Regions:
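Generic amphipathic alpha-helical segments used as scaffolds and interaction surfaces in large
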Residues: 2-9, 67, 141-142
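C-terminal subdomains that position terminal phosphate/3'-OH groups for nucleotidyl transfer/ligation
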Residues: 20-176
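Loop-centered beta-sheet repeat module
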Residues: 3-20, 27
Length: 176
């Protein structure tokens, strides 16, 4: 099973052989093993995540082909969503948590063939520990969709500021 192969310490040779024999693309259409050795190098024996490796293989969405648990399916989809967002690892950690942020950073590094940030662990730790300073009760004049849209807008502004804006700064944005 592909999951077992991707969970091994270094699946590069097995995946290369499967790719050369046409087995890999038969199981997972459109995939290629070429970035897996790079990912394995960046993992450095730590944080082996078979979902990250699955994403780095590329190809068509495997969530209907492979038997994934709901948690694995969510992790796969959220990591892809994070890759499309293209934010700093701290912003991804804030939005999705540590696991997705780590997968995101390693996948991007492997796919772009460039090292992940040196302070990756620090960025992820910071992002995952942050709490958005605005609460719905702070915007008690708003309700329903307007409240949700405003919170979303303010959160986006806060993330783009690299989490530097204070509650007071964010509240000023309401009047602009």
């Amino acid at each position: 099973e592909i999951r077992k192969i991707l969970k091994t310490h270094n699946p590069s040779l097995v995946l290369a052989a499967m790719d050369k024999a046409g087995i890999l693309s038969n199981i997972l259409p459109g995939t290629t093993h070429k970035n897996i050795p790079i990912l394995v190098h960046f993992e450095n024996g730590n944080s082996i995540n078979w979902i990250t490796r699955l994403i780095v293989l590329g190809g068509a969405d495997p969530t209907n082909t492979l038997r994934l648990s709901n948690k694995e399916r969510r992790e796969y989809k959220n990591t892809l969503k994070a890759i499309r967002m293209g934010n700093k690892p701290s912003a991804i950690a804030f939005e999705f948590g540590e696991i997705i942020a780590n997968s995101y950073a390693l996948a991007i590094a492997a796919l772009t063939e460039s090292a992940p940030p040196r302070d990756l662990e620090k960025q992820i730790s910071i992002g995952s520990s942050l709490e958005f300073p605005i609460r719905a009760r702070d915007l008690n004049s708003l309700q329903g969709k307007q409240l949700g849209d405003t919170l979303k807008k303010l959160k986006s502004i806060w993330v783009k500021s690299d989490f530097t804006l204070t509650k007071k700064d964010l509240m000023k944005n309401l009047n602009e």
